[in-house]
Structure formats: C-alpha cells, structure tokens
Amino acid sequence: MGITRDSRHKRSATGAKRAQYRKKRKFELGRQPSNTRIGPKRIHEVRVRGGNKKFRALRLDSGNFSWGSEGVSKKTRIIQVAYHPSNNELVRTNTLTKSAIVQIDAAPFRVWYETHYGILMGSKGKKATATPTPKSKHVQRKHSARLGDSKVDSALETQFAAGRLYAVVSSRPGQSGRCDGYILEGEELHFYLRRMAPKK
C-alpha cells in the first residue's frame, strides 16, 4: 500500500466509516518525508507529476541566510537545530525542515559588519583593527557616514560574541534541496528565546 493524500479513508464527522467506492489514484500519491539531517551535502532528484523535478535533500551543512535589518545575505554553515515549533523529536535528531530554528556560524556576517562599518562587532565605537592599517580618506568618510546605522540589538550582539546566531529556515529542504532562511531579530527573536528558555 502506498502513501496517499486522499481523505476518503477518514471517518466522517459523526464517526461513521465511509464506504470504499474507488481505489487509490496516482495523482493522490504521497512520498516518505526526507528527514534532512546536518552533514555533507547529499541531494536526490525526484521525478514528479508533469515531468517536473523535486530535489530531495537528505544531508545539508550550509545555506544562504539573510540579515533583514542590514539587507545582506551570506552563505554560512548550519551548526545545529535549536528549536522546532511542531516537534521536539526533530530537535533531538537535528532534522532540517521549514520553520526550524537553527544555529548558524556568525563569522561571515561579523566579517561583513566590520568591513562595512569599520568597527569591531560588540565594541562600542572602537576601531576595527588592533594594528591600524591606514585607510584612505574616502573609506573613512564612508565609515563615518554609516556609523549612525551601526546599532545592533543587544540579544544579537551576545550571539555574535558566542559566534552563533539563531536563524529560521524559510525554504523547504525536502522539496527544493536548499536550506535558506533569515536571522532572528527583534520581537521574533525574543519570542523564540522565551520558548527555548528552560522551564522552571
């Protein structure tokens, strides 16, 4: 028996069993979940209805994540699954799905921030390098003009100090073969931090 997406096999609202009036159809088929794990990239191509292709990611270790408030995206390493709104089992097994909260490597975003603003991440207005390399006046003007926008949320700053950022997966790894998403910040970050805090 194959996996099917029909509702004829379900009982009615009153609890009555429905009579079977036809067999399963090809257009109702479903497939096993991909259960994408963290590891060296392994993607299977699946031929689907209409001759189209789906890309079933079985293992992924990186993805493109965007930092919304700064308007920048970087490819970065996925470290682990920290929280999942639907199932704790997916956290325990490090399964990547859409809307999973993952920890990603902060290094690419830190490097971008320090070159863009010319200040060290987590240092109140200090210059970027311990051994100052001479910068052209043009670069200095650019950095000083950008300084007003360099404010980072304190919760995000502590994550940068630890080298790991919380992000949400917004793509569907079992369908598109990619694990892309965005960094959590603001109200959304505080909401998930409360959810992940150990219960007393």
Curated annotation (Swiss-Prot):
Basic residues bias: start-end ranges: 135-145
Positions of post-translational Phosphoserine modification: S62, S99, S150, S154, S171
Role noted for this protein: Component of the ribosome, a large ribonucleoprotein complex responsible for the synthesis of proteins in the cell. The small ribosomal subunit (SSU) binds messenger RNAs (mRNAs) and translates the encoded message by selecting cognate aminoacyl-transfer RNA (tRNA) molecules. The large subunit (LSU) contains the ribosomal catalytic site termed the peptidyl transferase center (PTC), which catalyzes the formation of peptide bonds, thereby polymerizing the amino acids delivered by tRNAs into a polypeptide chain.
Source organism of this protein record: Schizosaccharomyces pombe (strain 972 / ATCC 24843)
Keyword tags: Cytoplasm, Phosphoprotein, Ribonucleoprotein, Ribosomal protein
One Pfam family recorded for the sequence: Ribosomal_S8e
Major localisation: cytoplasm
Protein name per UniProt: Small ribosomal subunit protein eS8B
UniProt xrefs under InterPro entries: Ribosomal_eS8, Ribosomal_eS8_CS, Ribosomal_protein_eS8_euk, Ribosomal_Se8/biogenesis_NSA2
GO molecular function, one term: structural constituent of ribosome
Ranges where the record places region Disordered: 1-41, 124-145
NCBIfam families: eS8 (TIGR00307)
GO biological process terms held by the UniProt record: cytoplasmic translation; cytoplasmic translational elongation; maturation of SSU-rRNA from tricistronic rRNA transcript (SSU-rRNA, 5.8S rRNA, LSU-rRNA)
Compartments (UniProt record): Cytoplasm
Further remarks about this protein from its record: There are 2 genes for eS8 in S.pombe.
Subunit structure: Component of the small ribosomal subunit (SSU). Mature yeast ribosomes consist of a small (40S) and a large (60S) subunit. The 40S small subunit contains 1 molecule of ribosomal RNA (18S rRNA) and at least 33 different proteins. The large 60S subunit contains 3 rRNA molecules (25S, 5.8S and 5S rRNA) and at least 46 different proteins.
A single cellular component GO annotation: cytosol
Gene behind this protein: rps802
Record-stated family: Belongs to the eukaryotic ribosomal protein eS8 family.
